[in-house]
């Protein structure tokens, strides 16, 4: 009778785990997104989707940053594990125009040391498209994930075709479930 001596596989040793992935939520809060209290509005659906995505990252104890925008920055929360603060900052009504804050987005992304999942939910065309696409190409080549959800039936994903070639997911979606499931199916 012999007994097999088990050797611990170094791949499963403590300290060699994959780095945590953090979440950057970017939500359009312009007037065209509607009122958060109207279940049929794009903003209501965006916030519901965000809550579902936040829950996943909260369960994993990962950091989250939030940026709400219209013609100005309406919510700005740097990397945190204070998930209730993020949820609270999401509860605002839409107002104003749509101006995509790429400089602030770059600043938030560059302040993270972990791989990232960035989720952008909007019903309009992203302004300064060329600058945005160039930045997110580099972002994607660094192993990060990008989801852009267009909530307007008239929006076109053609502007973002280049980003899909780099691995971004660009989808026309109208419901919270579609947005949440699209993200979670990729990150789980």
Where are these regions (language model features)?
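Acidic/polar low-complexity segments with low predicted structural confidence
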Residues: 1-21, 180
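Surface-exposed acidic, glycine-flexible loop patches that form ligand/cofactor-binding
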Residues: 15, 56-57, 108-114, 138
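Basic/hydrophobic alpha-helical interface regions
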Residues: 16, 31, 83-84, 109-110, ...
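Von Willebrand factor
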Residues: 16-121, 125-131, 149-158
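A short, conserved beta-to-alpha structural element at the edge of catalytic cores
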Residues: 54-62, 141-160
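C-terminal helix of von Willebrand factor
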Residues: 101-103, 156-188
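A short acidic, amphipathic alpha-helical/loop segment
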Residues: 131-138, 159-162
């Amino acid at each position: 009778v012999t007994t097999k001596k088990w050797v611990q596989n170094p791949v499963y040793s403590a300290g060699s785990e994959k780095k945590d992935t953090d979440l950057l939520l970017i939500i359009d809060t312009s007037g065209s997104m509607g009122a958060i209290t109207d279940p049929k509005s794009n903003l209501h659906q965006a916030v519901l989707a965000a809550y579902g995505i936040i829950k996943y990252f909260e369960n994993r104890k990962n950091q989250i940053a939030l940026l709400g925008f219209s013609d100005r920055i309406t919510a700005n929360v740097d990397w945190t594990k204070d998930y209730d603060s993020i949820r609270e900052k999401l509860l605002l009504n839409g107002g104003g125009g749509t101006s995509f804050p790429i400089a602030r987005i770059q600043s938030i992304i560059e302040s993270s040391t972990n791989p990232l999942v960035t989720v952008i939910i909007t019903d309009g065309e992203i302004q300064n498209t060329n600058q945005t696409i160039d930045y997110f190409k580099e972002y994607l080549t660094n192993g990060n994930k990008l989801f852009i959800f267009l909530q307007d039936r008239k929006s076109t994903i053609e502007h973002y075709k280049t980003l899909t070639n780099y691995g971004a997911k660009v989808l026309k979606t109208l419901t919270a479930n579609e947005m949440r499931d699209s993200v979670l199916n990729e990150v789980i």
